[in-house]
From Swiss-Prot:
Organism this protein belongs to: Caenorhabditis elegans
The entry's keywords: Disulfide bond, Initiation factor, Protein biosynthesis, RNA-binding, Translation regulation
GO molecular function terms attached to this record: RNA 7-methylguanosine cap binding; translation initiation factor activity
Entry-linked InterPro entries: TIF_eIF4e-like, TIF_eIF_4E, TIF_eIF_4E_CS
A Gene Ontology term for the protein's cellular component: eukaryotic translation initiation factor 4F complex
Summary of the function given for this chain in its UniProt record: Recognizes and binds the 7-methylguanosine-containing mRNA cap during an early step in the initiation of protein synthesis and facilitates ribosome binding by inducing the unwinding of the mRNAs secondary structures. All 5 eIF4E proteins bind monomethyl cap structures. Only ife-1, ife-2 and ife-5 bind trimethyl cap structures which result from trans-splicing. Translation of trimethyl cap structure mRNAs may be regulated by intracellular redox state; disulfide bonds change the width and depth of the cap-binding cavity determining selectivity to mRNA caps.
Annotated Pfam families: IF4E
Name of the molecule in the record: Eukaryotic translation initiation factor 4E-4
Length: 212
């Protein structure tokens, strides 16, 4: 019996949590977005948690295809500065999961901005408006953004598809500085998602200003 148990294969299954807000058609007077986006969030479950199970706990909130739908969903979220618990808020192109292993993310990486508590709401909202307004001018290269609420700081990251495309990755960094009006001495860190997979961490062992 013991031998049978020891060789038993355990298969992890992602819990496909139902979306909280139904997908709605774009109204005739709405301002349609170039891409469809999905809001979702993750809150760490109580007790023991395996990072490999992250995707199982991502709760989709709603899909937006227009500016009007974007704001109709935004009003249902607490602002990052109002959140106390450790959580991640995701804003990704529809069909792209907010995990390193997703085909759109696995060869990419992310620019990371660390913020003192109390500053994340303005930066986060400005970043989302820049994304839906296509201010980055890199098309499919952007995958999405994450706002991570932590005890000592908040962290905002912008994910791109191809970490090896230095000119585009560089352009994303400079556009981030511009649209968020960051001081020139603000440190932006970069981390490839294959490195995240190796060390099972999103924000440790980053590289500062990797693209010179």
């Amino acid at each position: 019996m013991e031998a049978e148990t020891s060789t038993q294969e355990v298969v992890k299954q992602v819990k496909n949590l139902p979306i909280l807000m139904e997908d709605a058609p774009v109204g005739s007077d709405d301002h349609q977005l170039q891409y469809s986006y999905t809001f979702s969030y993750f809150m760490r479950p109580t007790g023991k948690f395996d990072p490999e199970d992250y995707a199982s706990y991502v709760q989709p909130v709603g899909i937006m295809k227009s500016v009007e739908q974007f704001w109709s969903i935004m009003v249902h979220f607490k602002r990052p500065t109002e959140m106390c618990d450790k959580a991640d808020i995701h804003f990704f192109k529809t069909g792209v999961k907010p995990v390193w292993e997703d085909p759109a993310n696995c060869k990419g990486g992310k620019w990371i901005i660390r913020l003192k508590k109390g500053l994340s709401t303005r930066i986060w909202e400005n970043l989302l408006m820049a994304i839906i307004g296509e201010q980055f001018l890199v098309g499919d290269e952007l995958c999405g953004a994450v706002c991570s609420i932590r005890n000592q700081e908040d962290i905002i990251s912008l994910w791109n598809r191809n970490a090896d495309d230095t000119p585009v990755t560089n352009r994303i960094r400079e556009t981030l500085r511009s649209v968020l009006q960051l001081p020139q001495n603000t440190v932006l860190e970069y981390k490839r998602h294959d490195d995240c997979l190796r060390d099972q961490s999103s924000y440790r062992h980053t590289t500062k200003n990797i693209c010179k």
